[in-house]
Structures are given as C-alpha cells and as structure tokens.
C-alpha cells in the first residue's frame, strides 16, 4: 500500500513527528493514522525516558492570572536549552501547567515530595474507615492502596488529570513534550495565591 503525502502531512500535524518517522509509522500500520499515532507516541515516550537523566537547568517561569485577578499561579518549568525554552510548544506547556495549578491547587510537584508521615496518616484513616466493613484484610489493603492513588491524584501535580483534558495526566503531558521537543523537561516548583486565603 502506498502512503500519500496528505496522510503524512496529517500525521505530522497531529504529532509533530518528522516526515520519515511519520512515513515509517504509516507504512507499518498500512495507512491507519490512529495506529500510527500510537506507534509514534510509544516511540516518543521511550525516547523521553532516556532523556530524563539529562540536566535541565534552563527554562522559564510562567504566570497565570485568573480573570478577575482573584487567583494567580506561578510555575517554574526547566529544560536543557534556552532554544527549547523559547519555543511555542514549551511556552504553551508552561502556561497550561500554570493554569492547571490555579484551577486545582495541588500541594506537591511529585510523589517524592509528599512526606511519608502524611501518606501513612492517610493510610491509617482509610484503614479505620474500612475495618468495620467485614471484608478480609487483603481486600481492605487493596482498597486502601487504591484510595492512596486517588489521594496522590488530589495533592500531587504530576499525578493529576489535566483540567483541559481529563483523559491525560500532567506527567503524561510533560512526557509528550519531552518526546516532541527532544529535551528533558522538569516541573521544578509552583506557587498559587488566592485573595482571602491563607
């Protein structure tokens, strides 16, 4: 089956991948654009994992001010070079992250920042809530672990569902940007301010 330039163009527009990568993915999937997107995403995420150990010391600080000037969020997002920091894709990622922080008010950037004592306290509360349910201990532990995942999703930025597209987690958004831009990207820190809150 021959692959048309229109198919390659459509795939490039949807993924940002190179022409040869798009053509190969389309050839491998017999022209199925959706399957080709999946292949390119998997390839990109594998490449992103390799880049995660590289130093990200450049970047930008993005500010989002909610209409009405009652909520503001500031996010520092780092990358490896100022060239990438100046791209529209990187600027959009930083803006989307700041908007997300303003909307969801997370407490931590990643799981590693959450104090172990806070996680254990939450586990204990969840165990107590389920102790009288009459369920076996191993089932209670599975319920508790599932709820701990939900707890992380409420307080950890990278574990949250993106407000503009709940089918995507923030960490996946960052991984996609790493794959597309070809550099390690790290959400370093954030702050959120709201009028009248402590």
Curated annotation (Swiss-Prot):
GO MF entries: translation elongation factor activity
InterPro entries: EF-Ts_dimer_sf, Transl_elong_EFTs/EF1B, Transl_elong_EFTs/EF1B_dimer, Transl_elong_Ts_CS, UBA-like_sf
Compartment(s) where it occurs, according to its Swiss-Prot or TrEMBL record: Cytoplasm
A single cellular component GO annotation: cytoplasm
Highest rank taxon of the organism: Bacteria
UniProt xrefs under CDD domains: UBA_EF-Ts
Keyword set includes Lipoprotein: no
Entry keyword Cytoplasm: yes
Record's keyword terms, sorted: Cytoplasm, Elongation factor, Protein biosynthesis
Region (Involved in Mg(2+) ion dislocation from EF-Tu): 81-84
Family that this chain belongs to: Belongs to the EF-Ts family.
Its biological purpose: Associates with the EF-Tu.GDP complex and induces the exchange of GDP to GTP. It remains bound to the aminoacyl-tRNA.EF-Tu.GTP complex up to the GTP hydrolysis stage on the ribosome.
Protein name stated in the entry: Elongation factor Ts
Species whose genome carries this gene: Herpetosiphon aurantiacus (strain ATCC 23779 / DSM 785 / 114-95)
Gene that specifies this protein: tsf
């Amino acid at each position: 089956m021959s692959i048309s330039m229109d198919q390659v163009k459509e795939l490039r527009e949807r993924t940002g991948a190179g022409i040869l990568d798009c053509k190969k993915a389309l050839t491998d999937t017999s022209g199925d654009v959706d399957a080709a997107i999946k292949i390119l995403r998997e390839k990109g995420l594998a490449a992103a994992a390799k880049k995660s150990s590289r130093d990200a010391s450049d970047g930008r600080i993005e500010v989002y001010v909610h209409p009405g000037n009652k909520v503001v969020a500031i996010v520092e997002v780092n990358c490896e070079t100022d060239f990438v920091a100046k791209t529209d894709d990187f600027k959009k990622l930083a803006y989307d992250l700041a908007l997300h922080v303003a909307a969801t008010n997370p407490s931590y950037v990643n799981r590693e920042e959450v104090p172990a004592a806070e996680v254990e306290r939450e586990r204990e509360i969840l165990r107590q809530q389920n102790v009288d349910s009459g369920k076996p201990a191993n089932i209670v532990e599975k319920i508790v672990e599932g709820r701990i995942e939900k707890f992380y999703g409420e307080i950890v930025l990278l574990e949250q569902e993106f407000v503009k597209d709940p089918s995507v987690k923030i960490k996946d958004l960052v991984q996609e940007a790493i794959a597309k831009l070809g550099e390690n990207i790290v959400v370093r820190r954030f702050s959120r301010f709201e009028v009248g809150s402590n």
